[in-house]
């Protein structure tokens, strides 16, 4: 199962934990993760003023695809920036078209709505993004901490970041690898 690749799209205002925890957990599982800056390779200021340095620009990272999963962190401003980006739309449409995994957390799923991705799926979001996500009846809503429906994995917020990341690992690498990664993290069951 070696050779799995992930693309995490980092926009100004992204939620730090929802970015770093999935990146860390996926890398622990042996997934090659590229953190791509929406606005280029310059450091990105996140929602709590933490700066994260992308590995690549989104433009360059997209050329290096395809990826096994494309992940969208949350954060209100971050999700808004993802939602307004034609480049994000192109990446998501490509991923959906090839039936690749798409993962989004917190307010991140609102970018799926903005770009017309995975209509008809059951999703979850941060409670504060629920009304926006459900406008137009394009999705079914779940209160689950992590929701998987077909090739779409969504989650609720910073406190669900580990579960979200481990669900992605299990999907890409299998339950055994997910369990091996989880054990030393000392997570509460």
UniProtKB/Swiss-Prot annotation:
Q: Where is the active site?
A: 106, 126
Under Enzyme Commission nomenclature, its number is 3.1.2.-, 3.5.1.-, 3.5.1.124
- Glycyl lysine isopeptide (Lys-Gly) (interchain with G-Cter in SUMO) cross-link: located at 130
- What reaction does this enzyme carry out catalytically? N(omega)-(1-hydroxy-2-oxopropyl)-L-arginyl-[protein] + H2O = lactate + L-arginyl-[protein] + H(+); N(6)-(1-hydroxy-2-oxopropyl)-L-lysyl-[protein] + H2O = lactate + L-lysyl-[protein] + H(+); S-(1-hydroxy-2-oxopropyl)-L-cysteinyl-[protein] + H2O = lactate + L-cysteinyl-[protein] + H(+); N(omega)-(1-hydroxy-2-oxoethyl)-L-arginyl-[protein] + H2O = L-arginyl-[protein] + glycolate + H(+)
Q: Which compartment or compartments is the protein found in?
A: Cell membrane; Cytoplasm; Nucleus; Membrane raft
Sites where N6-acetyllysine occurs are at 148
Gene Ontology cellular-component terms listed:
cytoplasm; endoplasmic reticulum; membrane raft; mitochondrion; nucleus; plasma membrane
Main location per the UniProt record: membrane
Keywords linked to the UniProt accession: Acetylation, Autophagy, Cell membrane, Chaperone, Copper, Cytoplasm, Endoplasmic reticulum, Fertilization, Hydrolase, Inflammatory response, Isopeptide bond, Lipoprotein, Membrane, Mitochondrion, Nucleus, Oxidation, Palmitate, Phosphoprotein, Protease, RNA-binding, Stress response, Tumor suppressor, Ubl conjugation, Zymogen
Annotated TM spans? none
Sites bearing N6-succinyllysine, chain numbering: 182
InterPro entries linked to this entry: Class_I_gatase-like, DJ-1, DJ-1/PfpI, Prot/Nucl_acid_deglycase
Task: Provide a Gene Ontology MF annotation, just one.
Answer: peptidase activity
Q: At the top level of its lineage, which domain of life is listed?
A: Eukaryota
Q: List Cysteine sulfinic acid (-SO2H) occurrences by residue.
A: 106
Q: Which GO terms describe its biological process?
A: autophagy; cellular response to oxidative stress; detoxification of hydrogen peroxide; DNA repair; dopaminergic neuron differentiation; glucose homeostasis; glycolate biosynthetic process; glyoxal metabolic process
Q: How does it sit in the membrane?
A: Lipid-anchor
Role according to the record: Multifunctional protein with controversial molecular function which plays an important role in cell protection against oxidative stress and cell death acting as oxidative stress sensor and redox-sensitive chaperone and protease. It is involved in neuroprotective mechanisms like the stabilization of NFE2L2 and PINK1 proteins, male fertility as a positive regulator of androgen signaling pathway as well as cell growth and transformation through, for instance, the modulation of NF-kappa-B signaling pathway.
Quaternary context: Homodimer.
Supply the name of the protein: Parkinson disease protein 7 homolog
